[in-house]
Amino acid sequence: MFVPWQLGTITRHRDELQKLLAASLLPEHPEESLGNPIMTQIHQSLQPSSPCRVCQLLFSLVRDSSTPMGFFEDYACLCFFCLYAPHCWTSTMAAAADLCEIMHLHFPEEEATYGLFGPGRLMGIDLQLHFFVQKCFKTTAAEKILGISNLQFLKSEFIRGMLTGTITCNFCFKTSWPRTDKEEATGPTPCCQITDTTTAPASGIPELARATFCGASRPTKPSLLPALIDIWSTSSELLDEPRPRLIASDMSELKSVVASHDPFFSPPLQADTSQGPCLMHPTLGLRYKNGTASVCLLCECLAAHPEAPKALQTLQCEVMGHIENNVKLVDRIAFVLDNPFAMPYVSDPLLRELIRGCTPQEIHKHLFCDPLCALNAKVVSEDVLFRLPREQEYKKLRASAAAGQLLDANTLFDCEVVQTLVFLFKGLQNARVGKTTSLDIIRELTAQLKRHRLDLAHPSQTSHLYA
């Protein structure tokens, strides 16, 4: 029975995924982007009037009434997993592998199955838009569709700006943004489906999902970290030595994973091998600033390892309670991680040393500053992503998901307004935006973060300080 989010699925579809990875590298020379077919297709996918390529593919396959019910259940199950996954590179990679698996299971003779990715086919941006940005699979009330479409327009506008490096001068945030500043700031937030913490279930996920995945006795799937490390170490500078906090033994452990087999992916010659397959990442680029990178390794850990969400929560509490004095957060992080026995609550040495290998600034950004990191930490469910399901309950969950009963919202946190503002904020960091527009976005984001009880450093500081 098909279960998403498995390392074995990624390795099994290596040949197809290599095409996707090759099409997710930036051109070697930026001036070549204008006529580059990959960049042209990505730009076209981000046009508000362009159809979703994944939706088009799926509808072309299910027109036939003989489409097996198992396809709908497998696809809905993948969508359910994506609903509880962080928006990052690893999630896009896992979704791509699972889509390959579903196609090979149910349409083995279709030509599209063996040419799923690459120019003229699906690209990383198409997977991001379908599964994580627009979430085309979500069941939505008819009266909400137009409002959500307006928010999706804003998201695609700023994602396109991150690709081109600038937001159109005609864009005006005040006239494009739905007014929320006069709404009541107390009580349940009207812009999303958050439940009160006193009435929400203990685990936060739906009851059927808890019965399917939760329980200390449930075995966990293998980590996806080896694939993440392998691919990024061979195609980018993100994991280049020396990582400031990786001592020699730690680096050798990371390299032992990478060197234990042939590289999963070897980038083509005519490509930028400093930024990796960044076109599968939300920011569509790898940029550095003040000891941080736009590709957050800690967000990748959330999607790649079952221990990561709890470990990072524990680390955050440890940093806050480490010293009673008014010591800066960056210093607190450095002091906590300076202990050679730091993070004993993480059993996997690879995860522990990857986190400890991050700079204090990277950890500060993820735990206390960046809205996208905070959103990822809020929506992720390690039980859904990494617990092996109970067979009978899993059959019920698949049927329910295929009927759309579990795809209306992420019950941990689901707010289109906040998600849209977070994308706009990332656009401020990675594209040229007018000063007035930038101030208006930060003002609205700050208010929404406060209303949703997301306690972070002020976004204006983060936008100037970190990548």
From Swiss-Prot:
Disruption phenotype: Deletion mutants maintain viral DNA replication and late gene expression but does not produce infectious virions. In addition, viral DNA is not cleaved after replication. Residues 191-452 are annotated as: Zinc finger 3. Keywords: Host cytoplasm, Host nucleus, Metal-binding, Zinc, Zinc-finger. InterPro entries: Herpes_env (IPR002597). Zn(2+) 2 binds at C296, C299, H366, C373. Residues 296-373 are annotated as: Zinc finger 2. The keyword Ubl conjugation does not apply. Residues 52-136 are annotated as: Zinc finger 1. One of its GO terms (cellular component) is host cell cytoplasm. Zn(2+) 3 binds at C191, C192, C415, H452. Zn(2+) 1 binds at C52, C55, H130, C136. Pfam families: Herpes_env. It is found in: Host cytoplasm; Host nucleus. GO terms for molecular function: zinc ion binding. Belongs to the herpesviridae UL32 protein family. Forms a homopentameric ring. Plays a role in efficient localization of neo-synthesized capsids to nuclear replication compartments, thereby controlling cleavage and packaging of virus genomic DNA. Facilitates thereby the transfer of newly replicated viral genomes to the packaging motor. This is Packaging protein UL32 homolog. It comes from Human herpesvirus 8 type P (isolate GK18) (HHV-8). The lineage of its organism: Viruses, Duplodnaviria, Heunggongvirae, Peploviricota, Herviviricetes. The gene is ORF68.
